[in-house]
Structure formats: C-alpha cells, structure tokens
Amino acid sequence: MYLQTETKDNSLIVKLKGELDHHSSESIRLKIDNNYNGNNHLNMVMDLNELTFMDSSGIGLIMGRYRNVVENKGVLLIVCDNNAIKRMLDMSGLLKIIKLYPSLDIALDKIKEVKNHGK
C-alpha cells in the first residue's frame, strides 16, 4: 500500500495506491489523521483511482475520516473511476453520504464551489 498526500486550498488530498486491507488500514489511518489534524485542514479528497483492492477495513477507514472531517465542518469527497472499487463503495452505503467524482480536478472544483457558496 502506498500513500501520498498533498495540500491544495486548505484541503488534504490523499492518494492511495495498491491494496487497502486490514494489514494496511491502521497505519494508513494514522498517517492520514496526523496530516489532517496536524495541519489544520478543513476538507479532504480521497483519490482511490489507483487502488487495486479494498476490503471492509478500507470502508471503515473512509467512514472514520468522513466523521472526522464532518466534525470539523468540512467536506470529504472520493475520486474513483475503478468499477470494482465503486461497486464496493456503493454496496457499503458510503455513496449515500459521500459524493463520488471521476477525477481529482472535478472534485477540487466542487470543493471550491461549496466554499464559494457556503454549502
């Protein structure tokens, strides 16, 4: 599992590559939380386009980050165009509460739109 983070407009961008499972989810969670909380980010975009596998631990990881971001009055968005991962997200019910976008650029534009309109 590979994790890359960057900051853009007060949003933490988290790019995950490889397999997100019970072996990797705890260390990934700690890295994401330390970066998000330690740098006073408001929003988060999780880019899952390069994930090759995700189990229920990955769903739990995303759900926990969603709660954290919402508690800080931020927005969490997911970027994913991988059909297998999208199906997992849909079956878990996450897509009922978290918006999904096909590209990082579109997700970042949506955050700017929300920020500019206060919604």
Place the predicted regions along the sequence by residue.
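STAS-typified acidic loop motif
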Residues: Y2-L30, L48
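Residue-level recognition of oxygen-bearing side chains
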Residues: A84, S103-I106
